[in-house]
C-alpha cells in the first residue's frame, strides 16, 4: 500500500512538473523576461522623472497616478485605493550650502523631511551649544543670526521628533538661523511626523552635516575663529488635507476570480534621494512582473493582484488599510509576495514545510531554468503573527495570510543606502532587477494555477508566547505555557527581557544572553541558566538572588524529549536554571516544574554539547492575551508570595492529614526523639543486636498520604516497585537506606516486626529518592518531602 502511494505521488509530481514545462504561457513569460524586460524603464521613471516619493508629496501622488496609468495601458483593471491623509503636505526642492570663511568649502549635508527650509540664502556665523545649555543673555547674543552646532549625532530623525522642544522655541526667539548636527556617511534622513497644522509649521531649519566637516568647523570655532556658513534649503509645505492612495491592478482569474495571488511593494520612499533601492526596486519588479504576465497572454485560474502601497515608511499604513478594509478576502488570498529587500536578485523563497510540500512540484520548473541567479525553494520555520513588522508583508502575516520570505542575495549592501542620500538609481543592479521580475511573474503564475489555495493549517504559530534561544549551533524555539504555569513563565520571560531584578545581571540586560549550556547529560537533559558574566563574582548557587516554589501542572509531563523545565536543588528552590529533556523522563514528574516545550530546533537541542553558547534569547508574543502578559519584578514577586502562601497551606494540610491518619490507625504508637512513630507488632528474641552485625531484613510500605507502594529489594534494601518483598542484608552502622529506617532497623531484634512512620526529614528529605534508571522501564521515585509508612521484619 505504501509503495503504491509513493508511486502515485511520484507520478503526480512528475505530471505537474511536465505540465509547467510544456505550458506555452510559462515559456512565453520566460522568453519575454529574457528578451523584452522593461523593469529598468519603470525604475528610471520612478527615480529620475518622479524622484523621492515622500508621503504627502506631489511626487508620491504623481507616482500613484503614473502607476495606475501604466497598469491600464497594459490592459489591467486598475484603481486608486484611498489609504489615508496627512493634514499638511511636503515637497522637497534642491539644497545648497558652503563655508564662506575662513575659507570657501562646499558642504555635504541634508535635512529630514517635513522640516523647515531657509528664507532664501541665509548667511551667518557658527555658535557651538549643548542642547541642555541655559540660554543666558550672553549666549543669546551669540545665537542671534547664527547657525547653532549641537553636540548631538544624527540618527535620521528630526530634532523635534515628537513635539517642538522648549530649547528650539528659545533658539527661534533668540534669532538663530538653524541647527546643525553631525552625521556619519552616508547621511541618513527620515521625516517629521507632527506637522498637523498649516498655521503652525516648522520654523527652524534642521541640518545634518557630514561628520568630518562638522568636526573641522567646530574645532575652528572652539579655537576662537569666526566661521561663516551659507545655506539655501528649499523645503516646501502644502496646505492639506492631502489624501494618499495605494495602487491596485487585477488580472482576473478564469476559474476562481474571487481567489487571489497578491504581488506587493511599497511605492513611497524617503526623499533625501530618489527612493531607488527602497523601494523603487521592489515597485519596478512588481510592475514588470504583472506586465510580463499580461503580455504573455496569461489567463490564471486565480486573480493576480498587484498592490503598490502608500505610506509604508510611516508604519505600513497603506497595506494595513487594505487588509483592514478587505477582511472578506483574507481566506481567499493564496499568497502575498512582497519585495522590499533591495536590488539583489531573488534566489529563493522560504516557506513552512506544510506549504513547501504542496507547492514544490510547481516551483521545480522555475528551479530547473538556466538562470544567471539560480532559484531554490527553501523550507523554513513556521510563520509568526507577531511584532511591529518592517515591511508590508507583515500586514498580511498578521491577518493569517501566507506571505513567504523572498531571499535576495548579491553584492549590494542594503544598509549602505537605506534611508540615506545614496538611495539613487546608480545603485540598482539591472540584471538582478530583470531576473527578479521574471521570477516573481513565474511564481505568481504557478501559484495562481494550483488546484487549491496554499494550505494554512500548520503554517502559522498559534497564539501564545515563544522564546527563541539563538545558540552557536542554531535556533531553538520554545513554546512558553504562560497560561497554565504563569509564575515560572513570568520568571523566565522576565529574566530574558531584563525586567526582573536579580543579583547577577544589570537591569535592562537579558539575563541569558551569552550564557552556556553548563550541564549536558546524553539521553537525559541539557541545562543552562547561569549568566556568563555575573556581578561581584557571585557564587552560582546564589544566582539569581531569589527562589520560588514549584508550580506543577498535571497537563504537562516529562514523557518525551523537548520538554522545558526548571532545574532545582529540592522542592521550591527554583531560580534561573532551566533544562530541556533529551528523552522520556517521566520519573521527574511532580518534582520539577515544566513550563513549555520545543516546537522547532530539536535537531539543535540534540547537537548541543557542554560549553555551547546561548548567544541571545528573544521573546515573541502572538495574540491579545499573550501581549497582555508583561511580567515585571513587582508582578512576579506578588505571584511568588501567593505561591509560598499556598505551599505553606498545603504543607499544613498535609501534616494534619498525616497526624489524623496516625491518630486513627496507630493510636498507641510510640514516638522517638526524632519524631519517628512506631508500633511493635511482634516481639523478637531477647538477643540484642550490635554494631557491624548483619541482619536479614525485609519490608513493605507506602508514601503515607499519596499511597505509592514499595517493597524492599535485595540491592542493599533499596525500595522499588517489585511485587514481591525481598530480603536483604543490613549491616548495622554500615548499610544506608534512609536515616529513619536505618535507626529503626538498628534498634530491632531478630524476629521482631514493627509498623513505622518515618517523617520526611528522617526519610529522603527535600531530595527524594530516585531508583535506578532502566531503559524501557518506569523509574521508581519517592518524591521529596514524603512521610513514609513501613512494615518491617527482622528475619534473622
Predicted feature locations:
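N-terminal hydrophobic or amphipathic helices/low-complexity stretches enriched
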Residues: 20-59, 69, 77, 251-253, ...
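Soluble metallo-hydrolase cores and metallopeptidase-like ectodomains found primarily
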Residues: 23-25, 108, 112-137, 196-275, ...
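Metal-dependent peptidase/peptidase-like ectodomains
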Residues: 309-409
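Noncatalytic luminal/extracellular "stalk/propeptide" segments of secretory-pathway proteins
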Residues: 44, 48-147, 153-155
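Extracellular/luminal Protease-associated
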Residues: 109-205, 274
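Cross-family detector of peptidyl-prolyl cis-trans isomerase
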Residues: 459-796
Amino acid at each position: 500500500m505504501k509503495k503504491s502511494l509513493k508511486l502515485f505521488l511520484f507520478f503526480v509530481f512528475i505530471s505537474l512538473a511536465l505540465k509547467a514545462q510544456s505550458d506555452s504561457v510559462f515559456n512565453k513569460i520566460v522568453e519575454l523576461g529574457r528578451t523584452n524586460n522593461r523593469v529598468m524603464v519603470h525604475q528610471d521613471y520612478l527615480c529620475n522623472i518622479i524622484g523621492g516619493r515622500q508621503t504627502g508629496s506631489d511626487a508620491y501622488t504623481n507616482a500613484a497616478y503614473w502607476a495606475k496609468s501604466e497598469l491600464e495601458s497594459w490592459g489591467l483593471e486598475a484603481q486608486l485605493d484611498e489609504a489615508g491623509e496627512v493634514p499638511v503636505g511636503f515637497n522637497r526642492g534642491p539644497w545648497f550650502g558652503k563655508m564662506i570663511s575662513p575659507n570657501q568649502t562646499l558642504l555635504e549635508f541634508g535635512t529630514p523631511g517635513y522640516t523647515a527650509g531657509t528664507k532664501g540664502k541665509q548667511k551667518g556665523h557658527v555658535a557651538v551649544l549643548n542642547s541642555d545649555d541655559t540660554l543666558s543673555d550672553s549666549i543669546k547674543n551669540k545665537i542671534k543670526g547664527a547657525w547653532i552646532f549641537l553636540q548631538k549625532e544624527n540618527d535620521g530623525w528630526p530634532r523635534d521628533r515628537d513635539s517642538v522642544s522648549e530649547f528650539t522655541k528659545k533658539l527661534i526667539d533668540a534669532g538663530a538661523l538653524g541647527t546643525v548636527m553631525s552625521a556619519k556617511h552616508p547621511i541618513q534622513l527620515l521625516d517629521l511626523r507632527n506637522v498637523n497644522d498649516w498655521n503652525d509649521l516648522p520654523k527652524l531649519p534642521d541640518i545634518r552635516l557630514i561628520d568630518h566637516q562638522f568636526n573641522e568647523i567646530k574645532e575652528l570655532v572652539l579655537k576662537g575663529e569666526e566661521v561663516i556658513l551659507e545655506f539655501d534649503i528649499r523645503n516646501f509645505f502644502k496646505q492639506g488635507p492631502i489624501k494618499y492612495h495605494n495602487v491596485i491592478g487585477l488580472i482576473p482569474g478564469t476559474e476562481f476570480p474571487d481567489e487571489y495571488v497578491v504581488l506587493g511593494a511599497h511605492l513611497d520612499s524617503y526623499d533625501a534621494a530618489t527612493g531607488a533601492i527602497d523601494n523603487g526596486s521592489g515597485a519596478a519588479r512588481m510592475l514588470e512582473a504583472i506586465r510580463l504576465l499580461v503580455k504573455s497572454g496569461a489567463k490564471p485560474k486565480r486573480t493576480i493582484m498587484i498592490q503598490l502601497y502608500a505610506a509604508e515608511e510611516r508604519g505600513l499604513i497603506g497595506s494595513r488599510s487594505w487588509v483592514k478594509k478587505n477582511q472578506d478576502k483574507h481566506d481567499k488570498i493564496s499568497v502575498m509576495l512582497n519585495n522590499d529587500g533591495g536590488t539583489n536578485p531573488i534566489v529563493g523563497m522560504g516557506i513552512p514545510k506544510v506549504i513547501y510540500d504542496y507547492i514544490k512540484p510547481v516551483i521545480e520548473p522555475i528551479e530547473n531554468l538556466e538562470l544567471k541567479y539560480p532559484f531554490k525553494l527553501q523550507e523554513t520555520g513556521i510563520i509568526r503573527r507577531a511584532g511591529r513588522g518592517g515591511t508590508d508583508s507583515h500586514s498580511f502575516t498578521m491577518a493569517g495570510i501566507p506571505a513567504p520570505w523572498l531571499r535576495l542575495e548579491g553584492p549590494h549592501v542594503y544598509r549602505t543606502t537605506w534611508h540615506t542620500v545614496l538611495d539613487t538609481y546608480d545603485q540598482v543592479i539591472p540584471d538582478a532587477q530583470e531576473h527578479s521580475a521574471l521570477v516573481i511573474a513565474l511564481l505568481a503564475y504557478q501559484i495562481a494555477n494550483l488546484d487549491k489555495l496554499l494550505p494554512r493549517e500548520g503554517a502559522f504559530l498559534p497564539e501564545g508566547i515563544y522564546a527563541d534561544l539563538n545558540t552557536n549551533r542554531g535556533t531553538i524555539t520554545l513554546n512558553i505555557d504562560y497560561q497554565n504555569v504563569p509564575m515560572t513563565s513570568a520568571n523566565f520571560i522576565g529574566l530574558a527581557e531584563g525586567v526582573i531584578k536579580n543579583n547577577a545581571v544589570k537591569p535592562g540586560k537579558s539575563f541569558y544572553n551569552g550564557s552556556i549550556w553548563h550541564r549536558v547529560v546524553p539521553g537525559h537533559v541539557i541545562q543552562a541558566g547561569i549568566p556568563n558574566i555575573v556581578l561581584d563574582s557571585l557564587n552560582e548557587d546564589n544566582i539569581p538572588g531569589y527562589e520560588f516554589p514549584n508550580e506543577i501542572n498535571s497537563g504537562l509531563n516529562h514523557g518525551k524529549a523537548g520538554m522545558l523545565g526548571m532545574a532545582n536543588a529540592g522542592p521550591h528552590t527554583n531560580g534561573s536554571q532551566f533544562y530541556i529533556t533529551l528523552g522520556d523522563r517521566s520519573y521527574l514528574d511532580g518534582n520539577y516544574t515544566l513550563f513549555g516545550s520545543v516546537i522547532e530546533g530539536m535537531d539543535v537541542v540534540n547537537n548541543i554539547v557542554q560549553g555551547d553558547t546561548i548567544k541571545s534569547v528573544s521573546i515573541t508574543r502572538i495574540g491579545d492575551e499573550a501581549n497582555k502578559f508583561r511580567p515585571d519584578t513587582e508582578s512576579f514577586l506578588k505571584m511568588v508570595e501567593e505561591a509560598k502562601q499556598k505551599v505553606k497551606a498545603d504543607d499544613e494540610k498535609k501534616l494534619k492529614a498525616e497526624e489524623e491518619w496516625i491518630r486513627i490507625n496507630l493510636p498507641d504508637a510510640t514516638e522517638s526523639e526524632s519524631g519517628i512513630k512506631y508500633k511493635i507488632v511482634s516481639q523478637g528474641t531477647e538477643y540484642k543486636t550490635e554494631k557491624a552485625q548483619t541482619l536479614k531484613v525485609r519490608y513493605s510500605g507506602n508514601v503515607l498520604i499519596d499511597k505509592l507502594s514499595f517493597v524492599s529489594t535485595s540491592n542493599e534494601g533499596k525500595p522499588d516497585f517489585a511485587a514481591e518483598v525481598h530480603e536483604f542484608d543490613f549491616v548495622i552502622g554500615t548499610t544506608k537506606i534512609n536515616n529513619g529506617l536505618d535507626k529503626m532497623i538498628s534498634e530491632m531484634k531478630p524476629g521482631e516486626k514493627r509498623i513505622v512512620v518515618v517523617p520526611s526529614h528522617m526519610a529522603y528529605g527535600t531530595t527524594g529518592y530516585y531508583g535506578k534508571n532502566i531503559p524501557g522501564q518506569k523509574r521508581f521515585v519517592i518524591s521529596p518531602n514524603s512521610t513514609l509508612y513501613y512494615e518491617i521484619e527482622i528475619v534473622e
